[in-house]
């Protein structure tokens, strides 16, 4: 079922909305009440579309940003009897679900990274294109600010943050420039930091790869909000909470997020049993199957409609019925072994020739017809 974007309220355009709805539909469209978790609610665009599409679905929405929660609450007011919003980070998901009495859920969405609200807010410090205090906290009620990181981290720690979280090859040079500059005067604004980074990076590198400060700002944001540490905890916990045939969809916006997602899913889709056994041992088979071939990328139309979708990578998976999957894998393995045995030297041809007096119409003990 498609969603008319004109019917969705507000100017915010959810990323890959139709694809997310398509992937979640089999899990959320089942008979009876279903539970959908939006682990990164933001402005509520994906949640609004899910609730409009699935009248029996209950929403549990999490966000660490109190301002985003306030906007989403207004946006989702017409679904109020099916909505429960929580001020929480996604690695707190198990605690939230336990408190609400949901041991398992049917669908979960992670739309990672910084939200449109945070990018567009002139006073939050996320954007290098406008001057603002160096805050960068998604939850402005707690935690270190980017200003504190920039002005207090020793050089080795600052360089590590820029190298690991920003994948910035000039990390040591930028860290040195920051340390020198802050000794003269604390760095308190996004514009000053962005200009310092621009001046520090060699001129040829400035002309490629977008804004020179992009990777530095990404690294600081990830450090301030503990994004990767939280995601590393949250993804396995979310997978554990899905019911059989429940589905997880993850939208990531840089390689570090996508890498963590890929690893978390890969761990669940492979067999953990001995490779040389003819049958799958109980408890060793895959517990999920992938719904996407690698990371799905946005199409040209999506990017034209929503430029912020340009860097998105989508991965999705579905929880398997362990009994049914074990039976299918055992049947497939038995079939493969029989085929291999038929072609082993000394076992004869895979095609059985009729013997004298055999009209070729009988069946063997396995119930398979003879070939004439």
Swiss-Prot record:
UniProt GO molecular function: rRNA (cytosine-N4-)-methyltransferase activity
Localization, UniProt: Cytoplasm
Gene Ontology, cellular component aspect: cytoplasm
Keywords linked to the UniProt accession: Cytoplasm, Methyltransferase, rRNA processing, S-adenosyl-L-methionine, Transferase
Compositionally biased region (Basic and acidic residues): 315-334
Enzyme class at the top of the EC tree: transferase
InterPro entries: RsmH, SAM-dep_MeTrfase_MraW_recog, SAM-dependent_MTases_sf
Biased composition (Acidic residues): 361-372
Top-level taxon of origin: Bacteria
Pfam families linked: Methyltransf_5
Annotated S-adenosyl-L-methionine binding sites: 44-46, 63, 97, 111, 118
The EC number(s) this enzyme carries: 2.1.1.199
BP terms from Gene Ontology: rRNA base methylation
Location of the region described as Disordered in the Swiss-Prot/TrEMBL record: 315-372
Reactions catalysed: cytidine(1402) in 16S rRNA + S-adenosyl-L-methionine = N(4)-methylcytidine(1402) in 16S rRNA + S-adenosyl-L-homocysteine + H(+)
Zinc found in the keyword field: no
Function according to Swiss-Prot or TrEMBL: Specifically methylates the N4 position of cytidine in position 1402 (C1402) of 16S rRNA.
Similarity remark: Belongs to the methyltransferase superfamily. RsmH family.
Official protein name in the record: Ribosomal RNA small subunit methyltransferase H
UniProt source species: Salinispora arenicola (strain CNS-205)
Gene: rsmH
